[in-house]
């Protein structure tokens, strides 16, 4: 599609944002005519959305959100089919409930009736998929809809030291809509948490590469150093910087598109 967006620096990132918005529309049951895209003008977005839907239907495909949408529509249109599935699943357990969206929840509510034997597990402080339509407020309003429920709060944290947990709690406490909870770290105190801010990703990679190089010069083996990333895309700038500083490293990432991998990009740059 030839558009004014052909000169976008990172087309993959642009397409990922479009994909998230399509998922959000379906998960929230929004009509595309009433949706305003944050990635591109409405007319362009609708053209992309309609083209995507046309291709999916033409090839008899279903994406994940379609499976939820069609299930929801089927249950609403065919009470007899819904009744059959209600009898089959008398007890329902849902994990990561903080990431549920509106349509998924509406489908589950229908499926759980009339006994409403729902067991949900989640952490409202861990909801990070709002950009995909996740609605943590559903978990917060759950007790109002199911008044006879029993709530169990598990406060033991077996992953983090108390220093990490204390820093995280101090930050998340500013969220206005959350369940208040007391957490206890089971891994001891640990080292202090240091927070640093950088103007650009390049400046961040430069600073971290220098810190790692300094640690190695002081005798720290490289295999005792680790960097954690939220997405694989964030690793690319670090890999280039580590090679510049002759820092040995191993990347544990899943390759979805080989041509987006930094190794392939280096090869292509020579072609």
Short names for language-model regions:
Residues 10, 26-30, 115-116, 171-181:
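Proline-centered turn/helix-capping motifs that create local helix->coil transitions or kinks
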Residues 14-28, 163-171:
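Structured, non-catalytic alpha/beta "coupling" segments that mediate domain-domain communication
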Residues 124-125, 253-257:
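Short, acidic/turn-prone active-site loops that include or flank metal/cofactor-
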Residues 243-247, 255-271:
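Conserved short internal alpha-helix adjacent to the catalytic or cofactor-binding core
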Residues 37-141, 156-160:
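Conserved helicase NTPase motor core
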Residues 1-20, 196:
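Conserved P-loop NTPase-based nucleic-acid remodeling module centered on helicase motor cores
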Residues 147-150, 155-248:
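Helicase P-loop NTPase motor core
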């Amino acid at each position: 599609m030839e558009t004014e967006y052909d000169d976008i620096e990172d087309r993959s990132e642009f397409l990922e944002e479009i994909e998230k918005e399509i998922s959000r529309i379906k998960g929230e049951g929004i009509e595309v005519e009433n949706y305003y895209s944050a990635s591109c003008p409405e007319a362009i977005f609708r053209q992309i959305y309609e083209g995507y839907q046309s291709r999916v239907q033409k090839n008899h495909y279903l994406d994940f959100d379609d499976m939820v949408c069609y299930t929801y529509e089927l249950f609403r249109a065919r009470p007899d089919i819904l009744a059959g599935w209600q009898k089959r699943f008398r007890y329902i357990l849902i994990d990561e409930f903080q990431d549920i969206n509106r349509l998924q929840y509406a489908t589950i509510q229908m499926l759980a009736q009339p006994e409403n034997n729902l067991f949900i597990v989640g952490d409202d402080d861990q909801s990070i998929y709002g950009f995909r339509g996740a609605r943590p407020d559903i978990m917060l309003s759950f007790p109002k809809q199911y008044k006879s429920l029993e709530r169990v709060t598990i406060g033991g944290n077996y992953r983090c030291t108390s220093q990490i947990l204390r820093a995280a709690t101090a930050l998340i406490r500013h969220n206005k809509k959350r369940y208040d909870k007391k957490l206890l770290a089971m891994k001891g105190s640990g080292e202090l948490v240091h927070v640093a801010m950088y103007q650009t990703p390049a400046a961040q990679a430069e600073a971290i590469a220098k810190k790692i190089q300094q640690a190695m010069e002081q005798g720290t083996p490289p295999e005792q150093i680790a960097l954690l990333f939220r997405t694989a895309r964030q690793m690319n700038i670090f890999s280039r910087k580590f090679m510049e500083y002759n820092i040995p490293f191993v990347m544990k990432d899943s390759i979805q598109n080989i041509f987006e991998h930094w190794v392939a990009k280096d090869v292509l740059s020579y072609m």
